[in-house]
Amino acid sequence: MSTVEPNAYDPQQVETSAQQFWDATRAFQVDENSDKPKFYCLSMLPYPSGALHMGHVRNYTISDVVSRYKRMTGHNVLQPMGWDAFGLPAENAAIKNKTAPAKWTYANIEHMRAQLKSLGYAIDWSREFATCTPDYYVHEQRMFTRLMRKGLAYRRNAVVNWDPIDQTVLANEQVIDGRGWRSGALVEKREIPQWFLRITDYAQELLDGLDQLDGWPDSVKTMQRNWIGRSEGLEIQFDVRDTTGAALDPLRVFTTRPDTLMGVTFVSIAAEHPLAQHAAKSNPELASMLETLKHGGVSEAELETQEKRGMATGLTAVHPISGEEVPVWVANFVLMGYGTGAVMAVPGHDQRDFEFANKYGLPIVQVVKLREPRNDDEQAWDATQWRDWYTDKSRELELINSAEFDGLDYHGAFEALAERFERKGQGQRRINYRLRDWGVSRQRYWGCPIPVIYCAKCGAVPVPEDQLPVVLPENVEFAGTGSPIKTDPTWRQTTCPECGGPAERETDTFDTFMESSWYVARYTSPNARDMVDRRANYWMPADLYVGGIEHAILHLMYFRFYHKLMRDARLVDSDEPVTNLLTQGMVIAETFYRDADNGGKDWINPADVEIQRDERGRVVGASLIADGQPVHIGGTEKMSKSKNNGVDPQAMVAKYGADTVRLFSMFAAPPEQSLEWNEAGVDGMARFMRRLWVQVHKHVGEGAAALDVASLSAEQKAIRRKTHETIGKVDDDYGRRHSFNTAIAAVMELSNALAKFDDASAQGRAVRQEALEAMVLLLNPITPHASHALWQVLGRGETLLENVPFPQVDAAALVRDALTLAIQVNGKLRGTIEVAADAAREQIEALALAEPNAAKFLDGLSVRKIIIVPGKIVNIVAG
């Protein structure tokens, strides 16, 4: 008998050996020529920021576990990887490091690829691409020119955040307290020409398609439904008059609550609305207000939270029923880019209008009441106190103060008003969507050039396909003020492809969501001359997509939309890009800080802190290792640079090995829940890996034997039963439930049972061999390096374990010779008995009545009946 010390497990040596074998055999390179069922498993591609974080590790490990499991269950599995390489962070890094964004990006890709490989992911690297290369973005340029010709891509003015110092457009998150994040300048709202894709043409299809996505989380589908925001209402015309009473262009407003029309006391328009601009020409005070409102937010979240501000324009709108004139106000919560840039204001039944009206002393009228109020609060109506029922149309309502419409409910009023307006040509029924067309222009350098040429004679002309790609110059000096291609006349100036006259290229670049909206299809045919080829229809739709729920709306909406564009271009056959979606939770960690001199907080990395915990593992004290002095405990939060609570995956792999890091990231929490990083937990996984290593080597030292199931003892049968119960559970946890933490726990239980199984006989060793082989294969999707090595130690040779079939349950092994039954007296547990699996009812009843503890509780009682739940419980009813 040989003994192996725990430190004999050398993760670095084991992992290097396995990875060399996989590389040499091109183990995970796949093609479409297979009679196996396909399985396409995909993680959301990373941005090459320079280093992996633990969120990446968790995401890609989930995908890898599923991919390896599917290979072992006989599937032809594609798991690719690429780089979402355009975007703002590269520009910021270029400014900071005084380098070209391209150089910074490609260096990061090299580093992060090496990090991914060190974690042992079963990736087909032959399909790798970066979205910033012309070989990739030429296809989206070609698609865009085709969409232009079909009318699905168009150009119009749109409001953006403009930094007047840096002369560039800012994303909403780059505006801090109304100022540019870098220059500190007051940000303006400015209208500039932008390119759009008509996603609204697909709004209903995007909505209907959600009903077919049974493998997507309900939470994601709900968010998409709300974002698409289908609503049925009326579009109503309000005539407009200026201060002299002269007629101006009428306003058209959309409302889902025409029943509240008689409660309109003013009309709100956006600061950029043509009527506001017209009124400002003769009103300097209004012109000043419009200039001020240019510095407000443009996102919906900002509109909800910012102070309501506005000013009367001096114009009036004519109520389409009463004929009364109501004032037209500019309001900062109305956006020109949403609907018509005008809304009918019903302060009695809309909270935003209510707040605005109270601030500026505008009339507030009740025109709806509840037919069956549930309390005094719902009976009362107060123009100075908002109550949620004012806007609730889910209850039985009745119109009041509404002339001939009094007494109607919501539906009756809707139909009556719709009929009236359609008959008089003042309005019409309309289905509206909250979803807006996708603005794809970005006034940035590091992105895919938009393939359009502007000619004074011919207008906007798509670049001919034989002149694509329009290549972005990469060797540039980037200072952050403006774009290098805007100031490069040799790149910008060209000739018109239609008339041959002088022309200029578009200097905007695509929104980076463009690149990530079709990459899933490009992986299927990365060397195709067109966007994709016939191989796409073999792999698409992808079977599993893994990523964060923060992408539920924008990325996943554009992702679905672009796939439908590709379908309509006959590039793919499927309606949806992905069948199943898994949204993993965040990785969180403890935070620690000290108060800074400036009143802020200096965040300290947990690796630099000595932590004291109570018996339940809660942090009760902490001190800085460097000086031994206390630090404040900030609680657990998402790992981030701002809170300095990130953990370097590379350092963890160097310390514990990739398998241990993978094991902990799968064991610490179910995939959909947040994972709290805890190095004590990582230590626990490392101990388990060493114990498994010792178990296998100790067993091999004793020698194996052939299994003879007919001659097994009761104890040997029990271990074999435990082995096959574990196989069944892990198979279900991997394949159906994606419950990797419980799969690991089941294997650990089997390992514990084996540790107590001290049987050195031939059949004892044979049962142990079967159990250890099963454990190695069951863990292979999570700890592939160690499994690769231990499979060889068990005498099975060096092979790709993904080609070894996943263990199968032997139903005969699950049959028990004896059963343990719980004994209840009047429903309360009083003991257990062991009975033969085929014991007769009379025998079970006799043993149950004779069980000592049960007999004690039956003393003096009469047994009325005995209920037996086969294989589980005997309940004695007595009184």
Curated annotation (Swiss-Prot):
The keyword Nucleotide-binding is assigned to this record: yes
Gene3D superfamilies: 2.20.28.290, 3.10.20.590, HUPs (3.40.50.620), Isoleucyl-tRNA Synthetase, Domain 1 (1.10.730.10), Valyl/Leucyl/Isoleucyl-tRNA synthetase, editing domain (3.90.740.10)
Chain positions of motif 'KMSKS' region: 638-642
Binding positions for ATP per the UniProt entry: 641
Primary enzyme class: ligase
Keywords attached to this entry: Aminoacyl-tRNA synthetase, ATP-binding, Cytoplasm, Ligase, Nucleotide-binding, Protein biosynthesis
GO MF entries: aminoacyl-tRNA deacylase activity; ATP binding; leucine-tRNA ligase activity
Localization terms from the record: Cytoplasm
Catalysed reaction, written as an equation: tRNA(Leu) + L-leucine + ATP = L-leucyl-tRNA(Leu) + AMP + diphosphate
GO cellular component: cytosol
Motif 'HIGH' region per record, residues: 46-56
EC number, as in UniProt: 6.1.1.4
InterPro entries: aa-tRNA-synth_I_CS, aa-tRNA-synth_Ia, Leu-tRNA-ligase, Leu_tRNA-synth_edit, M/V/L/I-tRNA-synth_anticd-bd, Methionyl/Leucyl_tRNA_Synth, Rossmann-like_a/b/a_fold, tRNAsynth_Ia_anticodon-bd
UniProt xrefs under NCBIfam families: leuS_bact (TIGR00396)
HAMAP family assigned to the protein according to its UniProt record, in alphabetical order: Leu_tRNA_synth_B (MF_00049_B)
Family the UniProt entry places it in: Belongs to the class-I aminoacyl-tRNA synthetase family.
Protein name stated in the entry: Leucine--tRNA ligase
Upper lineage: Bacteria, Pseudomonadati, Pseudomonadota, Gammaproteobacteria, Lysobacterales
